[in-house]
């Protein structure tokens, strides 16, 4: 099994915020796929299955406790691979980066996952830029002019993610799909 985790916060007030780009990408994948809904309270999130070996997870624990949901799914399904999609304030809106392992970079969702599951997983980092106040910036909604860039980046990221899942070659995918902004 491959587990793809999109990080975000639940609730209408968080829809279309910078912190929710992981949720947005999962929603984009679901919109274009036949899936089985495996959501169960024990998983602490929305869980979907595509085909025989791909799980998509949107934790419902809020960002700072995302690891609780990821651990519950990993413990139950014994996933061989995990890919986490998240916002990154250290890269500009429109940028896309890939990496495996390493530090959380101060991202509380990643800190939670690292604490409960370790940090040996692939990461898809979607740039959202850095505002004056980090917390309010990541919880702000995208401006209309930013939504155009975001839409293009999410579509590009979807293609990259699908190829990463299929080919399992992070270096090649990073070379082919990374974006600078």
Curated annotation (Swiss-Prot):
UniProt KW Transport keyword: no
Cross-referenced InterPro entries: Pept_tRNA_hydro (IPR001328), Pept_tRNA_hydro_CS (IPR018171), Pept_tRNA_hydro_sf (IPR036416)
Residue ranges of the TM segments: none
Keyword set, alphabetical order: Cytoplasm, Hydrolase, RNA-binding, tRNA-binding
EC number(s) on file: 3.1.1.29
Functional description taken from the UniProt entry: Hydrolyzes ribosome-free peptidyl-tRNAs (with 1 or more amino acids incorporated), which drop off the ribosome during protein synthesis, or as a result of ribosome stalling. Catalyzes the release of premature peptidyl moieties from peptidyl-tRNA molecules trapped in stalled 50S ribosomal subunits, and thus maintains levels of free tRNAs and 50S ribosomes.
Pfam family, one: Pept_tRNA_hydro
Signal peptide interval: none
Stated family: Belongs to the PTH family.
Subunit description: Monomer.
A single cellular component GO annotation: cytoplasm
GO molecular function: peptidyl-tRNA hydrolase activity; tRNA binding
PANTHER family (UniProt xref): PEPTIDYL-TRNA HYDROLASE
GO annotation, biological process: protein quality control for misfolded or incompletely synthesized proteins; rescue of stalled ribosome
NCBIfam families on file: pth
Official protein name in the record: Peptidyl-tRNA hydrolase
Taxonomic classification: Bacteria, Pseudomonadati, Campylobacterota, Epsilonproteobacteria, Campylobacterales
Chain sites annotated for binding tRNA: 14, 62, 64, 108
């Amino acid at each position: 099994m491959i587990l793809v985790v999109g990080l975000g916060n639940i609730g209408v007030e968080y829809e279309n915020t910078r912190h929710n780009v992981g949720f947005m990408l999962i929603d984009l994948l679901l919109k274009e796929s036949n899936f089985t809904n495996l959501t169960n309270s024990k998983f602490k999130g929305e869980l979907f299955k595509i085909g025989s070996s791909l799980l998509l997870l949107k934790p419902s624990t809020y960002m700072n406790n995302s690891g609780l949901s990821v651990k519950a799914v990993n413990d139950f399904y014994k996933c061989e691979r995990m890919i986490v999609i998240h916002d990154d304030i250290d890269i500009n809106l429109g940028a896309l980066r890939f990496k495996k392992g390493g530090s959380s970079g101060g991202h509380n969702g990643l800190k939670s996952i690292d604490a409960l599951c370790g940090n040996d997983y692939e990461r898809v980092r979607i740039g959202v830029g850095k505002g004056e106040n980090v917390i309010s910036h990541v919880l702000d909604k995208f401006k209309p002019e930013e939504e155009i860039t975001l839409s293009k980046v999410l579509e590009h990221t979807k293609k990259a993610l699908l190829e990463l899942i299929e080919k399992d070659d992070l270096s090649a995918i990073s070379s082919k799909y990374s974006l600078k902004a």
